[in-house]
């Protein structure tokens, strides 16, 4: 997918996500308009229930909007079938979750190799890429460790390596420090800062002001709408 500096990687136009629960109708997203350009570093903040995770799920092609338009590097996502969406998730977007979402019985190396199974790569090439990704996050000496042998910060580093191993255009992080203590949180944020500095587009959901302060742009949601969208100094 090609891009130019003036072209938005992500374009959201009048985006809605509506849930019907019996007689009740919930607008999780209520007419959202957002553009995000390549190499931006964006925090999405807001109270619980404001629509943050719903927005991330739609951007990450884990959910579909009820109406409105979502374009990913100029391509209408709403027109894609499930196979095309799966390909986007595997190749274009890397995910980091609060709960790590690692395979409990697999080593760090095998966890990071997992997204590459769907690529036309030899096992040796998959292994080499996974080793490189783990070394990038400072875990080159823990390749054979399982999640239960790692600290919370180390598990999140494995999750970040897994997100980056396929060289995606966009990194989505949903409360990446939510389960970590303050010191480990800052270590993880230093790593995410480095990922952004190396050219990655990073979009992060957080409710913590000190974590949002790492980003260059802050979008606050309230009741499914954009309350404000502000730039901030590095």
What kind of feature is each model-predicted range?
Residues 7-222:
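ABC family nucleotide-binding domain
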Residues 1-18, 228-234:
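ABC-family P-loop ATPase nucleotide-binding domain
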Residues 224-226:
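Generic detector of short, aliphatic-rich beta-strand segments that form the cores of beta-sheets
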């Amino acid at each position: 997918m090609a891009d130019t500096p003036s072209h938005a990687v992500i374009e959201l136009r009048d985006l809605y996500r509506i849930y019907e629960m019996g007689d009740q109708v919930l607008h999780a997203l209520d007419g959202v308009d957002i553009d995000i350009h390549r190499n931006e570093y964006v925090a999405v903040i807001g109270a619980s229930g404001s629509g943050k995770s719903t927005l991330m799920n739609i951007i990450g092609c884990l959910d579909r909007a009820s109406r409105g338009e979502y374009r990913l590097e100029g391509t209408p996502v709403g027109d894609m079938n499930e196979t095309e969406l799966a390909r986007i998730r595997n190749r274009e977007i890397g995910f980091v979750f609060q709960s790590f979402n690692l395979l409990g019985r697999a080593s760090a190396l095998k966890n990071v190799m997992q997204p590459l199974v769907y690529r036309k790569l030899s096992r040796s090439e998959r292994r080499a890429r996974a080793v490189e990704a783990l070394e990038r996050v400072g875990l080159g000496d823990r390749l054979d460790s399982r999640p239960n042998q790692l600290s919370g910060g180390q598990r999140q580093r494995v999750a970040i390596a897994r997100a980056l191993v396929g060289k995606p255009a966009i990194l989505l992080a949903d409360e990446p420090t939510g389960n970590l203590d303050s010191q480990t949180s800052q270590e993880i944020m230093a790593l995410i800062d480095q990922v952004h500095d190396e050219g990655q587009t990073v979009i992060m959901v957080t409710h913590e002001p000190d974590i949002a302060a790492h980003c260059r742009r802050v979008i606050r949601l309230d009741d499914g709408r954009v309350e404000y969208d502000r730039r901030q100094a590095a």
